[in-house]
Amino acid sequence: MDTKTHSLPITHTQLHSNSRPQSRSQCTCTHHCQTFSQSCRQSQRGSRSRSSSQSPATHQNPTGAHSSSGCQSQSPNASPPPKRHKKTMNSHHSPTRPTILHSSCPKNRKNLEGKLNKKKMAKRIQQVYKTKKRSSGRKSN
């Protein structure tokens, strides 16, 4: 078995000589991650370094970070924060749809209120049904 296992690494290293530099690049990657985490820690300590630490973060996540920063720099920046506040005010129902409909069409408010009332009534009916089951179960015992 020693001869077989010994012969395999020799052929493997001869065929794939790039495997060693890959391991080295991983070491540099972990070193880069360590330095990046240190910069994040420093940014948490000082508020001035936060702006400088955000720019490397955008380079690492180009799809998410650049799109969000692009939206923030445009004029619609004023409209999303009020929507977020409205979302927090709405309780459990899907917050995105009511905010859009409330702002666009006042006629749809009545429809939404009716739907919400129906949901509330359905919950009440279920609660009443459960309590009746419980009370009937207690009587039979």
Swiss-Prot record:
Gene behind the chain: TNP2
Annotated residues for binding of Zn(2+): 12, 16, 27, 29, 33
One annotated GO biological process: positive regulation of protein processing
Biased amino acid composition, Basic residues: 130-141
Tissue expression remark: Testis.
Sites of Phosphoserine modification: 136
Gene source species: Macaca fascicularis
Disulfide bonds: none
UniProt function note: Plays a key role in the replacement of histones to protamine in the elongating spermatids of mammals. In condensing spermatids, loaded onto the nucleosomes, where it promotes the recruitment and processing of protamines, which are responsible for histone eviction.
GO cellular component, one term: nucleolus
Protein name as catalogued: Nuclear transition protein 2
Entry keyword annotation includes Transcription regulation: no
GO molecular function: DNA binding; zinc ion binding
Family: Belongs to the nuclear transition protein 2 family.
Annotated Pfam families: TP2 (PF01254)
Biased composition (Low complexity): 37-55
Placement of sequence motif Nuclear localization signal: 114-122
UniProt-annotated stretches for the region Disordered: 1-141
The UniProt record lists the keyword DNA-binding: yes
Primary subcellular site in the record, as a coarse category: nucleus
Polar residues bias spans: 1-36, 56-77, 91-106
Subcellular location: Nucleus; Nucleus, Nucleolus; Chromosome
Keywords assigned by UniProt, alphabetized: Chromosome, Developmental protein, Differentiation, DNA-binding, Metal-binding, Nucleosome core, Nucleus, Phosphoprotein, Spermatogenesis, Zinc
